Amino acid sequence: MKMDVIAREQIIYGSLQGSNKNKDWTSRLPPPSAYTLDLMSKKAKTTTGGSSNGSNATATSTTTSTSSSIKHKQPAGSSNNNVGQSQSKKTKPSGSYNSNSNYYYYAADEEEGGSADYALSNYDKKAVEELSLRLLDELRAAKSRHLTCTEVSLPCDLTPSVAREIIRVSEKEPRGIRGCTIYIEFEDEPKNSRRIASIKVDSDTVSTFEVYLTLRQDHRGWTSLLPQFMKSLARTITISPEYTITKNKLYSADGLGARRSYSFGSHAHRPSAAIATPTN
């Protein structure tokens, strides 16, 4: 019995029915059908759209997080680029910058202006404090040298108030407070005053004006109730909160000094507001 094996070979290799030739697998494959192409294009669009949406969402979230982090970091001055640009802004105010940078530059300029005002205010406070301490030192030195007493009591805000007024009257002077010479006079009785100290604020600066500070003795304290012989034993002088500042310019257009008198101090009695200078 003879068996036909050609049909089996045709089934295995996919040859055409009724042909004894096998399919040539080295030949080029036929193009896919239009239906297959349509399905593949739709699938590709769906996949690409989903991936692009995901990437856009990722990029958007990344951009949002990045921009939000920049907004939080830039005002604090933690960005290296902004630090360098703000420094160049200080040296080159006329430079051109983008809108986002301008926001921070203007904020920095406002802060600098605020900090400048704040620094000036601190300078005034420091000058007042230094001059107030110098006045206290001169009063301590004059206590035993000119006042012949063991204790000098004065209102707690007297020397800061005097220092503020002296600095205020020196604002329009060509050399400011550095060109001031202060003469301190003490008046124990009406129209009976004597000079007890003098201060040249800056010894290296030529004086352009003088300030005469007149302090008065307060006779309303507890020592006024003592008998005369007890007053000499107490040897305590109480300074009144009232004082007089007289400003004398050492220059003018016509060659004569312009003498101006200013009276400062509270006329109200300030009870128990006193500082006792200890005995050296």
From Swiss-Prot:
Region annotation (Disordered) maps to: 39-96
Q: Where is the composition biased (Low complexity)?
A: 46-69, 77-96
Biological process according to GO: apoptotic process; head involution; negative regulation of growth; negative regulation of signal transduction; regulation of TOR signaling; response to oxidative stress; sexual reproduction
Specify the superkingdom: Eukaryota
Keywords from UniProt, A to Z, are: Apoptosis, Cytoplasm, Developmental protein
Subcellular location(s): the record lists: Cytoplasm
The record's listing under Pfam families reads: RTP801_C (PF07809)
The entry's cellular-component GO terms read: cytoplasm
Cytoplasm: is it a keyword of this entry?
yes
* Family listed: Belongs to the DDIT4 family.
Entry function: Inhibits cell growth by regulating the Tor pathway upstream of the Tsc1-Tsc2 complex and downstream of Akt1. Acts as a cell death activator during head development.
Question: What is this protein identified as?
Answer: Protein scylla
What's the source species for this entry?
Drosophila melanogaster (Fruit fly)
Encoding gene per record: scyl
